[in-house]
Regions:
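Secretory/endomembrane lumenal or extracellular ectodomains immediately following the signal peptide
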Residues: 2, 27-113, 139, 222-309, ...
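Conserved alpha-helical segments that form or flank metal/cofactor-binding pockets of metalloenzymes
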Residues: 114-148, 317-342
Length: 438
């Protein structure tokens, strides 16, 4: 259920409780607030030096494009290393390929604007792999090449105001999930409607996911990522409507229908909320909502790590980011799994109640949350605890909440009554207002 009648998109949330402030400060020490953007020239130099690096995990070297449709969002026979990594360790490679393509070419916003958003997030974190792919995507159209030239040439002020605002929005939301102020948001709203704002936000969230996936797995940059790219317009996703407004497609109607059906058939280990408010917001862009949901379900189904461990990871990430909405959801999920309330009480303060395996997972997750990268030693320790497949799943769960924290608290989505009730049953009457100033 919605709490209140109006959902205000993307306003700053101020965390008033001292416990959360200290927890978040410790978890995110050394983060990138205020750091200069990495230049595109430096990222390209870094990327060329990463062609022959050793990844943290095995890649499906023999995988062909025929086995994973649209492995390359631009089409053709290329299979990126992020698809090879997922194919080796999960069954979710086809769904992720579809997600990438849908984020870039689905919805109503310009693909080039969304590609530039991915590039900007790569600049924030210094992700050479992500930047190489984002620039390749931009080179696949005339307008993309023009946008890329402006960014490389330091002529960002020459961009249309809507594009400049989108890039600023991406940077603010990437640096801090509460980084978009009311005034920042009102400037965005002057150029974009609610559905477009949701699409912008999902693109920023996806880029934060994508950077962490690529960096956690230490993926080598493919040599072909630097090759000239022919003009590309993938068929089947974006066809210019003759009407003055875009018509909802059969696929988008199916996405909405599928979400309604799923709410009536609760998933094992789910939260029991029906359609959560996060889903209600995402369904303003049904194609992206469906692609994200299908990918998430494909990762979760048949996972090697337990559902409880997944929730411990997402709790740690959400607490580190100061995300009210997602923290309440993780408490609800852990409570529904039967986790001892005493453990939940302790987890709000420190890690003393965690098992050795849980501590290994959440420690890794916090590092990946903070800087969007980890060391070889960090990943080796994770593999020693969970094996290679389990380590990949820990990374994917962390990435998922880099996405969800920014989407939910970034858009200031209201917590559902059921989530509030569960939280306050553990932490006391008025705990949501006390802990989250909400």
């Amino acid at each position: 259920m919605l709490r209140g009648k109006t959902v205000r998109l993307s306003v700053a949330i101020f965390i008033g409780a001292s416990f959360l402030g200290s927890f978040r400060s410790a978890a995110l020490g050394g983060r990138l607030d205020g750091a200069a953007l990495h230049s595109l020239s430096s990222l390209e130099e870094m990327a060329r030096g990463k062609i022959k690096i050793t990844p943290h995990v095995a890649l499906a070297e023999g995988l062909s494009a025929a086995e994973v449709p649209n492995a390359d969002p631009l089409g053709g026979e290329r299979v990126p290393n992020y698809i090879r990594a997922l194919a080796q360790h999960t069954k979710a490679a086809p769904q992720f390929a579809h997600l990438v393509r849908t984020v870039l070419y689905g919805g109503s916003l310009s693909p080039e604007t969304k590609m530039a958003i991915v590039l900007r997030v790569a600049q924030v974190y210094g992700s050479a792999y992500t930047a190489a792919h984002a620039q390749r995507w931009l080179r696949a159209s005339e307008s993309g090449r023009g946008l890329l030239a402006a960014l490389k040439g330091g002529a960002e002020e020459s961009l249309p105001s809507a594009d400049s605002l989108a890039l600023r929005y991406a940077e603010l939301l990437t640096r801090d999930i509460h980084g978009v102020s009311d005034s920042d948001f009102q400037r965005v709203r002057a150029h974009y409607n609610d559905s477009q704002i949701v699409e912008l936000t999902m693109t920023v969230c996806f880029a934060n996911y994508f950077v962490r996936l690529n960096e956690a797995l230490n993926l080598p940059v493919e040599a072909w990522a630097f090759e000239p790219t022919a003009n590309v317009q993938p068929a089947g996703l974006r066809e210019s409507p003759s009407a003055r407004v875009a018509l909802i497609s059969d696929e988008e109607m199916e996405a909405t229908r599928a979400a309604l059906a799923a709410s009536r058939s609760p998933q094992p280990g789910g939260l029991g909320l029906g359609i959560a408010n996060s889903q209600r917001a995402m369904l303003r862009v049904p194609a992206l909502a469906q692609a994200w949901r299908e990918y998430g379900m494909s990762v979760r189904n048949g996972a090697a790590i337990s559902r409880e461990l997944q929730l411990h990871i997402s709790f740690a990430v959400s607490m580190a980011n100061g995300c009210r909405y997602c923290t309440l959801h993780q408490v609800l999920g852990l409570k529904r799994l039967g986790v001892d309330p005493k453990k939940l009480l302790a987890m709000r303060k420190d890690d003393s109640a965690l098992t050795k395996s849980e501590l290994a997972a959440v420690s890794f997750a916090r590092k990946l949350t903070r800087m969007a990268t980890v060391t070889d030693e960090d990943f080796a320790l994770l593999k020693a605890e969970f094996g290679e497949r389990g380590a990949v799943e820990v990374a994917l769960q962390t990435c998922a909440f880099a996405f969800m924290n920014r989407f939910t608290d970034g858009l200031r989505l209201p917590s559902e009554d059921e989530a509030i009730r569960a939280y306050q049953e553990i932490y006391g009457a008025g705990a949501v207002a006390r802990d989250w100033n909400w």
